[in-house]
Amino acid sequence: MEIKSAEFVISNTDVRKCPEGNKPEYAFIGRSNVGKSSLINMLTNKKGLAMTSQTPGKTLLINHFLINNEWYLVDLPGYGFAQRGKENREQLKRIIENYILDREQLTNLFVLLDCRHEAQKIDLEFMEWLGESGVPFSIIFTKIDKISKGRLKENLKVYTDKLLETWEELPPIFLSSSEKKEGRDEILDYIESINNSLNN
């Protein structure tokens, strides 16, 4: 897929205020500092489209970007940042859950995982909840340029083995590096294949 245009449309905390219409939406979510904004900028080839921050948990809004005037890329708030207050965490949880469960246009949710770390309980529980809720999702392992190929292979095996303890089959999995633009074509082609199937 060639990205010809990518433009910011709206930020909000209320799923009812998301764009109207029936364009498919592909949302991206992950723990704070997983590299989500950098990945979005890499996918769209627009360096400043999604704001990157050195401060974990900075993104508190649902951000919609219109791609090629055909589909929306949705940047969801990061989850699991411990320094947020309890009230703030509960508010974020509601924002995320309301979008994921109530947004009919949500076509696929990309769950971002930092490949440098072992399987985290919060990520596994989140994906378990997605499965129980019938939400279609895929996994993107980020920052693959930050560790050796051997370590990457080892970490992926541990992660997939952990998932297969409760899953009959694995969701689609992608490997990415925002700095080296690895995984870009595979992720965009996957989105394009879903869009094509929706149009047929």
UniProtKB/Swiss-Prot annotation:
Its cofactor is Mg(2+). Residues 22-197 form the EngB-type G domain. Mg(2+) binds at residues 37, 59. CDD domains: YihA_EngB. SUPFAM superfamilies: P-loop containing nucleoside triphosphate hydrolases. Belongs to the TRAFAC class TrmE-Era-EngA-EngB-Septin-like GTPase superfamily. EngB GTPase family. Necessary for normal cell division and for the maintenance of normal septation. This is Probable GTP-binding protein EngB. The gene is engB.
